[in-house]
Amino acid sequence: MDPVEEVLNNPATRAYIHRLIGDEGINLLERFPKDGEHSDEDLAASTGINLNSVRHTLYTLYEKRLAEYHRIKNNETGWLTYLWQLRIDLLYDAIREDMETVLSKLERRARFEEENDFYICKDCHDIYTFTVAMGGNFTCPNCGQPLSHFENETLAKALRARIEIMKKTLGHA
């Protein structure tokens, strides 16, 4: 089976790709010629997809290292032509990199939740750290109502559970 077809037939990897490049990008991948390198103009012409959409998709894939190009300069005009090829074989590396980024953000958020006390306005539902609440004499800066202690243990536990699942998935001990 073709690597692109294999990726697009898997619901999880298809969803990841779709989040990156949308419907038109998926359409381009489905129609991308199997072999060789192709200019963005040739891809637009052969697939019937708008040139700007083709370029946007290719640049987005390039940012994740899922497409690569090399340039050829026309010596007469000085114009550059970019010849593209897909690197779908690097998809799992891109997913792993994104998961590592999310894991790092979740860990920072969990630390923030665990290291702070929070107060909530029962009317506005805005939440403030202890420092901010104390600075406003435990009254809501928006509506003047008194702030109540907000128990964030459920959120902190949920973050820690998600972090553990991601660590196991990524092979972290």
Curated annotation (Swiss-Prot):
Residues 9-92 form the HTH TFE/IIEalpha-type domain. The keyword Transcription regulation applies. It comes from the Archaea. It holds the Pfam family TFIIE_alpha. One of its GO terms (molecular function) is DNA binding. GO terms for biological process: regulation of DNA-templated transcription; transcription initiation at RNA polymerase II promoter. Keywords: DNA-binding, Transcription, Transcription regulation. Belongs to the TFE family. Transcription factor that plays a role in the activation of archaeal genes transcribed by RNA polymerase. Facilitates transcription initiation by enhancing TATA-box recognition by TATA-box-binding protein (Tbp), and transcription factor B (Tfb) and RNA polymerase recruitment. Not absolutely required for transcription in vitro, but particularly important in cases where Tbp or Tfb function is not optimal. It dynamically alters the nucleic acid-binding properties of RNA polymerases by stabilizing the initiation complex and destabilizing elongation complexes. The winged helix domain is involved in binding to DNA in the preinitiation complex. HAMAP family: TFE_arch (MF_01909). Monomer. Interaction with RNA polymerase subunits RpoF and RpoE is necessary for Tfe stimulatory transcription activity. Able to interact with Tbp and RNA polymerase in the absence of DNA promoter. Interacts both with the preinitiation and elongation complexes. PANTHER family: GENERAL TRANSCRIPTION FACTOR IIE SUBUNIT 1, TRANSCRIPTION INITIATION FACTOR IIE, ALPHA SUBUNIT. This is Transcription factor E.
